[in-house]
Amino acid sequence: CVITIITRGDNEVLLAKNARNPRPVYGLIAGFVEVGETLEEAVRRETFEEVGIQVKNLQYLASQPWPFPSNLMLAFRAEYAGGDLVLQEDEISDAAFFKFDELPEIPFAGSIAHAMIMHVTQGHAVADDTKAWL
């Protein structure tokens, strides 16, 4: 799986609410890599499918074992490159760019999504060992 944190400018981050989660938690864009697809292609495809925007300047950040369904989450950072937010409503119920100091509720500490958001919005370092980072 790929999980991506998308920034716009120097102080905005894209966060999205999963349509299947009743809690008001905003997380990151994530999805499965398709057969024959590179990780970068998966990031671009999942981003466009789920929120309708283009991204550029992809950077690998870290990985985290994900037990359901026996996967590995590969974390990327990307920059907004264009397009209007158009939601894939069966996956995403809301998405917006939030100022770093005006974030909604985000995923729990210990999740790779939380660590990625803290890295981008508060400058927390990415550890060489992701388990130490989390």
Describe the predicted segments one by one.
Residues 50:
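Short alpha-helical functional segments enriched in proximate histidine and acidic residues
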Residues 29, 43, 47:
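Hydrophobic alpha-helical positions that pack around
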Residues 1-28, 32, 54-55, 78-80:
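N-terminal strand-loop-strand
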Residues 64-87:
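Active-site-adjacent beta-strand/loop module that shapes the phosphate/pyrophosphate-binding cleft
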Residues 22-26, 88-134:
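Nudix hydrolase/Nudix homology domain
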Residues 37:
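Surface-exposed, charge/polar-rich loops and edge strands
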